[in-house]
UniProtKB/Swiss-Prot annotation:
Pathway: Bacterial outer membrane biogenesis; enterobacterial common antigen biosynthesis. It catalyses: UDP-N-acetyl-alpha-D-mannosaminouronate + N-acetyl-alpha-D-glucosaminyl-di-trans,octa-cis-undecaprenyl diphosphate = beta-D-ManNAcA-(1->4)-alpha-D-GlcNAc-di-trans,octa-cis-undecaprenyl diphosphate + UDP + H(+). This is UDP-N-acetyl-D-mannosaminuronic acid transferase. It is an enzyme of class 2 (transferase). One of its GO terms (biological process) is enterobacterial common antigen biosynthetic process. Its EC number is 2.4.1.180. It holds the Pfam family Glyco_tran_WecG. Keywords: Glycosyltransferase, Transferase. Catalyzes the synthesis of Und-PP-GlcNAc-ManNAcA (Lipid II), the second lipid-linked intermediate involved in enterobacterial common antigen (ECA) synthesis. One of its GO terms (molecular function) is lipopolysaccharide N-acetylmannosaminouronosyltransferase activity. Belongs to the glycosyltransferase 26 family.
Length: 249
């Protein structure tokens, strides 16, 4: 049974048996998460074609996704599939990196306590400094991504003791989803978000596609041209293309 939260205003769309929230725009998503007296609790997970395919073969990942309350369309292919399957759908792509920045800006305005996990030590330090300078974010703790498995419980206790209401984890999938799942068992009173390489992008260590490429839905192509080694990952996505055009969504 899925733990996905349902509301009258935010529709759910199902792609390959995976329910996904369909948001009209970024502002609606941010307002939805901050609609109460404090930010919502639960787990945010970005959904793209690669993750859909992986979840079909990886039972553990599928279980993690089923338990996440807020699954949103991060990949343009997911948005196009939703529109194909549900012609009246008013849904847009919500890029995880952009959502993270929008939530951090809102957290700064609201005074929401934030805990950052993941990234290299220097990148994490730069991320903290920029968040404080740019949006006055209330960062109550942090931990880089280089810690031993036996240190996990101590990290979970630090997060709990900090009183953080928003925890972001930059460790890549599925490591970040596993960490968030386990941390929520220890401390459920926060919103958790897996952000992959967002800290690197935010601090300028990794360059995103120009805005025109993003608006055309070609960010994947820009990444491929920048990192030719990704070609093998792109070949795997041909299976999703077949799902899309055959209507097996």
């Amino acid at each position: 049974m899925t733990a996905l939260k349902t509301t009258e205003t935010i529709p759910l769309y199902t792609i390959r048996d995976l329910p996904i929230h369909g948001f009209r725009n970024m502002a609606q998503f941010v307002d939805y998460l901050f609609a109460g007296e404090r930010v919502e609790t639960g787990t945010l997970v970005a959904i793209n074609a690669e993750k859909v395919l992986t979840a079909e073969k990886d039972v553990a990942l599928r279980t993690l996704l089923d338990r996440a309350e807020y699954k949103y369309a991060d990949g343009i292919s997911i948005v196009r599939s939703i529109r194909r399957k549900y012609p009246q759908a008013d849904v847009t792509r919500i890029a995880g990196a952009d959502l993270w920045e929008a939530l951090m800006e809102r957290a700064g305005k609201e005074g929401t306590p934030v805990f950052l996990v993941g990234g290299k030590p220097d990148v994490l330090a730069q991320t903290e400094a920029k968040l404080r300078a740019q949006w006055n974010v209330n960062i109550v703790g942090s931990q880089d991504g280089y810690f031993a498995p036996e240190q996990r419980d101590a990290l979970f206790e630090r997060i709990r003791a900090s009183g953080a209401q928003f925890v972001t984890v930059a460790m890549g999938s599925p490591r970040q989803e596993i960490l968030m799942r386990d941390c929520r068992h220890h401390y459920p009173d926060a919103l958790y978000m897996g952000v992959g390489g967002t800290y690197d992008v935010f601090t300028g260590h990794v360059k995103r596609a120009p805005l025109v490429w993003q608006n055309l839905g070609l960010e994947w192509l820009y990444r491929l041209l920048s990192q030719p080694s990704r070609i093998f990952r792109q070949f795997k996505l041909l299976k999703y293309v077949a799902y899309h055009y055959s209507g097996r969504l």
